[in-house]
Amino acid sequence: MSIRGWGLGRISALLLLSLLTVTLLAGCFGLDRAPRSVRVSDSTASSDVPESTVGASHIDGGLAGTGDTSAHATFVEKAVESGGSGNDADTMLAVRYGVHDDYERAVIDLGTGERPAGTVPEWTLTSSDGDGLLRVDLPSAMTTYVSGGKFGEGLLGSFHVVRSPDGGMFVDFFVHQPYRYRVLQMQDPARLVVDFEPTGVNLDEPPPAQGGNTVLVDPRPNSTVSDPLTVSGYSRNPEAANTVTLTDPRGEVLVRRNVRSNDWSHTWGYFEATIDLPPFSGKGTLKVGTGNARDGTFEGVEVPVRTSR
């Protein structure tokens, strides 16, 4: 063997040995441990943020420490509730889900960077009576390992992690039936637990409409709209591009507006547009979404609305 060939072989062997050593050390110190969800999304995140996944992990067995806490917490129908302290927890590590005899549970695991946080940061919960939407605002959350997913066919339907226009992130939970809720704050590691208890069968207002990579929060289907019209929601459409179109009963376009969301590659991005409505009466159709990159066909949400005039 030539000296050149021997030298290359020796270098290759050293590189392989170094790689094996790094791999073993990573396993020993848990460096490769990251929250896992059901399936990975098709989108890619930038190099300075973790790649978010789609799906809710199931809670295995009972949630440690919740027994004593839940015994002193009651289910309520409050419109607004808040709690937590500080802003050290800046990451949503996972969203987990469990079904109990008379309620369903969602758990937000919170972290500082890649590691579990010790205390629950400041949060605000908003809920409307008879509405299929409950929102948890986390102003300190800057990144997330999970962007959304489905729960099941019972009370809880799905969730979305959205970058807030005011900074931080919020989690929207979509619910199929009227409900009451209770919130539990768990420390070391930090977890925010929301339990949902059904209270009826039919909602006064259904959850926001969903289609393609778009969620339309306002207006809801069959809403009465007036001038000016505020359209809000969130999406994961390519390049954060969204088109809002309102047509009259004959299908003629009354107004069209392009609006960008504040994220799309990492998690759901919020958008909002205020539109001056031209004169029209009767029913209309509101479409929010984008065109398919290959054939231009519409992908998004389409809901009926009516004018108040």
List each language-model region with its residue ranges.
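Bacterial N-terminal signal peptides that target proteins for export
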Residues: S2-L15
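C-terminal motif of bacterial Sec signal peptides marking the signal peptidase cleavage site
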Residues: L24-G27
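Bacterial signal peptide processing site
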Residues: F29-D32
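Signal-peptide-cleaved, periplasmic/extracellular N-terminal interaction regions immediately downstream
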Residues: D42, D48-V217, P221
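Ser/Thr-rich low-complexity repeats and stalk/linker segments
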Residues: P221-R309
